[in-house]
């Protein structure tokens, strides 16, 4: 993440000075433009983010991906066997937890299954969590998770996922969803998220680092499981 922000020029190796940003806005530039009256939406930190992004090559997320919605069957459809049903609580930027509920295979035979390179993005609850799938899946996600499919070759899926999980997008999600009592990020707002575009070679470099970090994380998980098994066997042997 540090390398991404550094390459985008949003941080550097020099000591940071405290920046005080003040804004004075007219009603025509606030409520009439955005429809928002909550003060949180107009915090100076968001103006600063906008000013920094304005200096970079960018595109709207909706220009880069095709956004697909999933289904929301309701808790009455939950069962212990069938197609795994992934909810936001099962999703994090490092992967998917094993879902605790399933859906009937016959009833939901035609429900969309996310495929390889699909980016899962949460829009409700813990908004803005992104994870890219490495393989095709036989699972269904809740309606609170969008399926993003990259349609422009100028952006790599791993790079885009990294940006989506970065403070650059987190702040945009925070601004958009902050006015709701229950956090909800509208798909129309998500499509307007500003994505900085780095040159292809730098995207490839960052993507390779992301892949390497996931591989190391998987290896660490295997070693941890083996260590736990050894401890359990040692305890059983001395019992």
Task: Enumerate the language-model features and the residues they cover.
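Non-catalytic DNA-recognition/assembly elements of restriction-modification systems
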Residues: 1-71, 200-239
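A short beta-sheet element
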Residues: 109-112, 122-163
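Glycine- and charge-enriched low-complexity intrinsically disordered segments
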Residues: 157-168, 175, 179
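A short glycine-rich beta-alpha junction/loop motif
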Residues: 139-146, 179-202
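Short coil/turn segments at secondary-structure boundaries
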Residues: 16-17, 73-82, 175-177
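Sequence-specific dsDNA recognition surfaces
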Residues: 59-74, 89-116
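Short hydrophobic-aromatic micro-motifs
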Residues: 85-87, 119-122
